[in-house]
């Protein structure tokens, strides 16, 4: 993917937003493309934040992490994910890193169930990344969410044969049940947790207004971290209060 294509894309986005007078003050830093599995991550993090235990389902969660080196590569990865056609429709997302205790800046993830699926998917994605973005873009397999590995370092171990490989602690099940019970009481028969706010309800082909507004936030983020590549994309980058607050 040539840099010129990304420059044209940003120009087109700006024209659409300006002509239609769309409010660019938007809260969002991630663009998802939903797969066949719904992970219920909001529920899992509620359990973790309350008790610092890792939910059972998260022990089979593996991700391919891709680390674009600049804002242009991040938008290229977004385009790759948009057209990515895998054997299974796996969830993927592009984002800018705003968590204070997590390293890195630009990231992409492909969600997998189990290490074997992650290894297989990485083999499939490697030539695609090489041909569309470049051979030097870092990519690797990680287990679950970074916060879990910080609280429980052995969780980061990928190899089940390693003595430090972490397995689910069965005593944590009661903690999960406590949160599930609380959530059921709160909603009283309604949908337990609505994760559709993270996704489009159906994956739409091509860029959406929501995508465009998140990309605007990415541009402001790039400016904040002094990524010089953002100057190639736009001379006027709208202010993002959502991103700015993340740096406080």
Where are these regions (language model features)?
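Structured alpha/beta or helical-core interaction and ligand-binding surfaces enriched in interleaved
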Residues: 1-248
């Amino acid at each position: 993917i040539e840099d010129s294509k990304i420059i044209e894309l940003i120009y087109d986005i700006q024209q659409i937003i300006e002509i239609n007078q769309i409010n660019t003050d938007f809260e969002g830093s991630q663009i998802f493309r939903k797969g066949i599995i719904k992970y219920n991550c909001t529920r899992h993090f509620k359990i973790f934040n309350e008790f610092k235990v890792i939910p059972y389902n998260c022990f089979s969660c593996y991700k391919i992490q891709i680390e674009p080196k600049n804002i242009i590569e991040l938008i290229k990865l977004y385009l790759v994910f948009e057209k990515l056609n895998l054997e299974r429709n796996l969830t993927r997302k592009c984002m800018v890193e705003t968590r204070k205790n997590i390293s890195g800046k630009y990231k992409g993830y492909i969600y997998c169930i189990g290490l074997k699926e992650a290894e297989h998917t990485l083999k499939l994605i490697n030539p695609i990344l090489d041909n569309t973005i470049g051979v030097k873009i870092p990519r690797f397999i990680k287990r679950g969410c970074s916060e879990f590995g910080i609280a429980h370092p052995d969780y980061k171990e990928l190899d089940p044969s390693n003595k430090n490989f972490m397995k689910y602690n069965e005593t944590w099940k009661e903690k999960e049940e406590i949160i599930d019970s609380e959530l059921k009481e709160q909603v009283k028969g309604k949908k337990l947790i609505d994760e559709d706010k993270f996704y489009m309800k159906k994956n739409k082909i091509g860029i959406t207004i929501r995508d465009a507004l998140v990309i605007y936030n990415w541009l402001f983020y790039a400016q904040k971290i002094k990524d010089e590549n953002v100057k190639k994309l736009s001379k006027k980058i709208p202010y993002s209060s959502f991103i700015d607050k993340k740096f406080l």
